[in-house]
Design a protein with these regions (language model features):
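Short, aromatic-rich membrane-interface segments at the entry and exit
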Residues: 36-45
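N-terminal membrane-targeting/pre-transmembrane regions
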Residues: 1-34, 116-118, 126, 130-133
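Transmembrane-cytosolic junction motif
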Residues: 51-68, 72-73
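Non-transmembrane, membrane-adjacent beta-strand/coil modules in membrane-associated proteins
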Residues: 58, 72-135
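Generic alpha-helical hydrophobic packing signal
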Residues: 67-68, 78, 124, 147-153
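Hydrophobic alpha-helical transmembrane segments of multipass integral membrane proteins
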Residues: 23-30, 44-54
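C-terminal/domain-terminus segments
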Residues: 134-153
Length: 153
């Protein structure tokens, strides 16, 4: 395996979305603390959990090497797909991620696909393997598929 990826893409969540999530979680932690009086630990717990979730899903990173495709979400999730198992790749426009997958992130779709999607990125590739069909977010789906096809040939 070469150390440099043939194709690489980083998809970050937009900052207003993160700010909204953080403010919502802070309010959920702060309001009960104020009402119940002095439960500062509840606010600290919600804040820590929110920061952990944001760090875990802030960035989706896609790297294609000669022998494998690696998709990483934050610090904890990593999916490896061997190039030899890839059958077909095509650009794909997600019509409605909330309806099909119930949101963004790591999801199983109602249509049987396995989605690895980033918030507010509706362009993707559809990657077929013998076991599963993956939908992977990409801001440049044509380039991503071209890179996969060049590695396959």
């Amino acid at each position: 395996m070469s150390s440099m990826p043939i194709y690489e893409e980083r998809l970050n969540v937009n900052y207003p979305f993160i700010g909204g999530i953080f403010l919502f979680a802070l309010a959920v932690g702060l309001i009960p603390s104020i009402i119940l009086g002095g439960l500062w630990w509840l606010t600290a717990l919600y804040t820590a959990l929110t920061i952990g979730i944001i760090v875990s899903f802030f960035q989706m990173r896609v790297e294609l090497f000669e022998d494998k495709l690696i998709i990483k979400f934050g610090l904890f999730y990593r999916k490896v797909i061997e190039v030899e198992k890839m059958q077909d790749c095509s650009p794909y426009k997600m019509p409605h991620p909330m309806r099909t997958y119930g949101g963004w992130g790591i999801r199983k779709g109602r249509d049987g696909t396995f989605a690895l999607t980033q918030a507010f990125v509706n362009e993707a590739i559809k990657l077929e393997t013998p076991e599963k069909t993956f939908v992977i977010s990409s801001r440049r789906p044509e380039s991503f598929c071209s890179a996969i096809k060049s590695v396959k040939s």
